[in-house]
Amino acid sequence: MLPDKYVKSNYLKNLRSATNEFLDSNPDLTKSYLYLLLFLYDLEFFTISWVAENYGMNKKNLSDRMIYPLLSSGYLYKHFDKLTPSQTLEDHLFRDETKYNYRVRYAMSQKGRLAVQRFYASLNSPDSSI
């Protein structure tokens, strides 16, 4: 064992144990769902195409296996749907999307944001009990 003066504070040392404890306390989440929520945490909203390209997954697999299950369990929600009316004049004047090329925007719900915050807190605590 190294002396304490050589060991620095690194919250990622708790990553494996914190992940396992977090997933045990949240049975509706899997490790891949958690990683996707961590990826999406700082985004206001997103499209499936953008996430598939930047997350490195096939669009069909991402939507069927990850986005829609997280949507149905309440971790994500539809931020802008095709039927969502715009309320501002600027949106009506400068909108370059029509009903034929419109993509639904998704966002992380409060439940998803709180789950990610709890996970971050468990990484920082030495005794990661969630």
Which residues make up each language-model segment?
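Short, amphipathic alpha-helical interaction segments positioned at domain boundaries
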Residues: 96-130
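Short acidic, hydrophobic short linear motifs in intrinsically disordered regions
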Residues: 45-54
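Short, locally clustered residues in the helix-turn-helix/winged-helix DNA-binding domain
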Residues: 34, 38-42, 120
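Short, Lys/Arg-rich nucleic-acid/phosphate-binding segment
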Residues: 80-105
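Short amphipathic alpha-helical interaction segments
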Residues: 56-72, 77-81
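Residue-level marker of regulatory loop/turn positions in helix-turn-helix DNA-binding domains and
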Residues: 28-29, 40, 97
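Short alpha-helical segments that sit at the start of domains
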Residues: 4-36
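Short glycine/proline-centered loop/turn elements that form peptide/ligand docking sites
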Residues: 26-30, 46, 63
